[in-house]
Amino acid sequence: MPELPEVETVRRGLQPVMEGAKIVVAEARRPDLRFPFQPDFVARLQGQVVTGLGRRAKYLMADLASGDVLLMHLGMSGSFRVIKPDNDAAPGEFHYPRGKDTTHDHVLFRMSSGADIVFNDPRRFGYMKVIARNALEDEPLLRGLGPEPLGNEFDAAMLARSCEGKATSLKAALLDQRVVAGLGNIYVCEALHRSHLSPRRIAATLATRKGEPTDHAKRLVGAIHTVLNDAIKAGGSSLRDHRQTTGELGYFQHSFKVYDREGETCKTPACGGTIKRFTQNGRSTFWCPKCQK
C-alpha cells in the first residue's frame, strides 16, 4: 500500500492540472470501489472548481468551490493517470504497471484545464467520498488521526506525550495512525534504523518519568523527517511500479538501509551487522540487531 511519500508524490503530480480547474465531466463507471459511491457522488462534483488539492495522512483531499471536499484513497492498487492531448503521464502510479488496458479505469474527471484524470484500481481497495468541509471533523475515516509527521506540531515533545505509558513496541506505536498519521511499514523500519532504535523497544521509553522527551525521541523525530523528505524528493519507493508525473520510477528504494534487505550487511558505518527480518503484528520488520538498541 502506498505510504505518505507516494501519496504526496501523487498530489504534487495532480496539482497542476486540478487546482483552479473545473470538473467539466465526472464519471463513476461502476457502483463501488471499496465502498459504494454515494448516490449524489457525480452530481456534487460535476461543474465544481477545485480550489485546492491537499493531503491528510494517506488521503488526498480536493477542496471544491461548493464547500465540499473530495476525499480519495489509493488503496492497494489505485493509481491516477493524467491524459492530455499531447501527453500521457502517471503521477505517482503505485504498485501496478501502467499500460493501455482501461478495464480497471473506474473514475474519470474531465477538467477545464484540458486534462482527463483517470483513476485505475484493479483490486478496488481504493475509495472516494464527497464530504461537506464543515463535517470533516466528524468523518469516521479522518476522526482520531494523529499529527502529520512533516507538520510543525509534530516534534519530540508531542511524540513523547503520545507514547508516555505505552507498553506496546515502538514500531507498533509508530504505525498507530492515532499517534502519527501517514507512516507505514517501510518508512517506520527505515526511521527506526536511522535513529538506531530497536523496533522491539517499549514505546514508553521515549518519555522520561516527568513526561519529557528523551534523546531517543529526539533522534527518532529527526529520522522520520529525514526519511520522509528524502523519499518525497526521490519520488517515493518503487516496490513494483511506482511512477512520478514524468512516468519515471520512484527511486527511494535504492536508499533503503534495512527494508527488504534481509541477510545483507548493515549500511551503518563501522557496524558490520547483518539485517534480520521477523514478523511483528502481522508485518515483516527489517532491522539490524547490532546497531539498533
From Swiss-Prot:
Classification via InterPro entries: DNA_glyclase/AP_lyase_DNA-bd, DNA_glyclase_Znf_dom_DNA_BS, Formamido-pyr_DNA_Glyclase, FPG_cat, MutM-like_N-ter, Ribosomal_uS13-like_H2TH, Znf_DNA_glyclase/AP_lyase, Znf_FPG/IleRS
Residue ranges the record marks as coiled coil: none
Cofactor binding description: Binds 1 zinc ion per subunit.
Catalytic activity of the protein: Hydrolysis of DNA containing ring-opened 7-methylguanine residues, releasing 2,6-diamino-4-hydroxy-5-(N-methyl)formamidopyrimidine; 2'-deoxyribonucleotide-(2'-deoxyribose 5'-phosphate)-2'-deoxyribonucleotide-DNA = a 3'-end 2'-deoxyribonucleotide-(2,3-dehydro-2,3-deoxyribose 5'-phosphate)-DNA + a 5'-end 5'-phospho-2'-deoxyribonucleoside-DNA + H(+)
MF-aspect GO terms: 8-oxo-7,8-dihydroguanine DNA N-glycosylase activity; class I DNA-(apurinic or apyrimidinic site) endonuclease activity; damaged DNA binding; DNA-(apurinic or apyrimidinic site) endonuclease activity; zinc ion binding
Chain sites annotated for binding DNA: 104, 123, 166
SUPFAM superfamilies: Glucocorticoid receptor-like (DNA-binding domain), N-terminal domain of MutM-like DNA repair proteins, S13-like H2TH domain
EC number of the protein: 3.2.2.23, 4.2.99.18
Domain of life of the native organism: Bacteria
Gene Ontology terms: biological process: base-excision repair
Residue numbers annotated as active site: 2-3, 58, 283
Keywords, sorted A to Z: DNA damage, DNA repair, DNA-binding, Glycosidase, Hydrolase, Lyase, Metal-binding, Multifunctional enzyme, Zinc, Zinc-finger
A Pfam short name: zf-FPG_IleRS
Residue spans, zinc finger FPG-type: 257-293
Names of required cofactors: Zn(2+)
CDD domains: EcFpg-like_N
Subunit composition and interactions: Monomer.
Annotated family: Belongs to the FPG family.
Primary role: Involved in base excision repair of DNA damaged by oxidation or by mutagenic agents. Acts as a DNA glycosylase that recognizes and removes damaged bases. Has a preference for oxidized purines, such as 7,8-dihydro-8-oxoguanine (8-oxoG). Has AP (apurinic/apyrimidinic) lyase activity and introduces nicks in the DNA strand. Cleaves the DNA backbone by beta-delta elimination to generate a single-strand break at the site of the removed base with both 3'- and 5'-phosphates.
Protein name in the entry: Formamidopyrimidine-DNA glycosylase
Higher taxonomy: Bacteria, Pseudomonadati, Pseudomonadota, Alphaproteobacteria, Hyphomicrobiales
Gene: mutM
